[in-house]
Amino acid sequence: MFETSSGLGVKTKQIGKPTPRSILCRSPEMDALIRAECAKLIDDWKQKAFEYDGLIYMMLKEETEGVVPLYIGKAETIGKTNGNLSINIKNIKTDTQKFARWGDNYKYHIGDLSAAVLLGHDPKEIKYKYIDWAGSLFEKNATDAPVFKRKVFFWTMAWSSKNLGPWIEFGPTRLTFLEYLLIGLASSAFGDVLLNREGRNRA
């Protein structure tokens, strides 16, 4: 998921002007996967086929019993106005600020996680949600040398409205409902590690 230097150490880079800040580096494989799956969404939207609802994605962590889900989310093809292509994927080939919700900017996963983990960020940009993420993923935060506790992985795919979800009796499953179902299942099976705050099954 992230680009590593040695062992479980995670590489960082500087972005922003006039005052640069450090952010965590996504792996080239993660970047390529997101761009490839978003290309399907963009082509589908341009052709007005409207087969794909968007991306479903998971962040996962290696545990002794295997790989377990840490966070489940989605990035929809259509934006909030007039059927336009979502700004989260619109310029995915060249722009990493939003990057299908995994962008480098604040208010996106990489930017906000970096604020919680790395030194030098404005305290007002450090969100409780990502403090939780940082505690789950990294040996320590407020550091300039981030190190994973365990290996972390990323998976995503372009989700067709014709695809079946985990409950095949429901038939073709739309992206929003799929996300709801997957979070519910993961919270039941892996509730002690799942980082999603919304959509969890109540104990």
Spans of features found by a protein language model:
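Boundary/linker segments flanking structured domains
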Residues: 1-70, 74-203
